[in-house]
Each structure stands twice: as structure tokens, then as C-alpha cells.
């Protein structure tokens, strides 16, 4: 009987570790800044980002601003050529669409593709911007939106 109890406890512990390992917790901190061809960008270096300057292009709640997106990847990742960017606030599961079906441009500023955009987020706090090329998530950028 002791063997079965030990086996059951071991299996439960193993199952718990498996479930814990599969849980992906997101880090709601502003994405890293990086340089590409002399431009400072916010995002994931060599994957996804947009030109960003914390003084000039900082996000303020309800204010629109221009942002040049840059994408890095293999040619087949850009077959769809249309980009959608959805935004989610850290305190709310509701998603809003910031960019819907905009076409990617050619290489620019060291990136494989680029895309100009106008974006505005409605309230302050941390936001996750999910950028899709076609139906595939290309990456996520976390931004802080300030009160004016």
C-alpha cells in the first residue's frame, strides 16, 4: 500500500510541475529599446519594433502619434503582407484593433519590412501590442501610456 501511495504522490508532483511549466506568464513591463541604423526602437531586437523616443513619441492617453513599424524575419513570414495590431490593457481583457490590414512596405532602416502607422491608446497604463502578419503573431511590444 505504501508503494501505491508513493507512486500516486510522485505522479501528482510530476503533473503539477508539468502544468506549471506550461503556464506562460507575461511580463507587463515596457519592452526594451534598441538601435537599428541610427534609430531608437521599442520592441524585440531583430524581430519587431517601431521608432520610439520617450520625449518626442511617448504615448499619452487619447493622443494619436505617428510610429514607423519595422519587421525582421524570413521571406515566407511576410507572404501575407497585411498587418493587424491588436492592443490589450494590463487591467482589462478587452482587445482593441489599432491597425487593421495595412500593407507592409519594403526593407527600411535595417529591417526586412516596414510600415507607417498612426496609433492612439485610450487610457494610461501598460498595453500589449500584438502584431500579426496575416493570421500569424509576429511579436508583441509592451508600451507604457502616460496621463497628459
Region spans (language model):
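Short, aromatic- and glycine-rich surface loops/edge beta-strands on solvent-exposed regions
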Residues: 127-133
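Short tyrosine-centred short linear motifs in exposed loops/low-complexity segments
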Residues: 123-125
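Contiguous segments within soluble domain cores/interaction surfaces
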Residues: 25-120, 133-148
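C-terminal motif of bacterial Sec signal peptides marking the signal peptidase cleavage site
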Residues: 18-21
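Bacterial N-terminal signal peptides that target proteins for export
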Residues: 1-8
Amino acid at each position: 500500500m505504501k508503494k501505491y501511495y508513493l507512486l500516486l504522490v510522485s505522479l501528482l508532483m510530476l503533473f503539477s510541475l508539468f502544468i506549471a511549466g506550461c503556464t506562460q506568464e507575461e511580463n507587463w513591463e515596457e519592452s526594451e529599446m534598441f538601435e537599428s541604423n541610427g534609430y531608437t526602437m521599442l520592441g524585440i531586437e531583430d524581430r519587431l519594433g517601431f521608432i520610439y523616443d520617450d520625449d518626442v513619441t511617448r504615448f499619452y492617453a487619447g493622443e494619436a502619434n505617428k510610429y514607423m513599424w519595422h519587421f525582421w524575419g524570413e521571406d515566407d513570414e511576410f507572404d501575407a503582407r497585411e498587418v493587424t495590431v491588436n492592443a490589450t490593457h494590463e487591467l482589462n481583457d478587452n482587445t482593441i484593433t489599432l491597425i487593421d490590414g495595412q500593407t507592409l512596405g519594403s526593407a527600411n532602416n535595417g529591417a526586412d519590412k516596414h510600415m507607417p502607422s498612426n496609433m492612439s491608446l485610450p487610457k494610461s497604463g501598460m498595453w500589449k501590442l500584438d502584431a500579426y502578419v496575416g493570421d500569424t503573431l509576429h511579436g508583441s511590444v509592451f508600451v507604457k501610456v502616460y496621463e497628459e
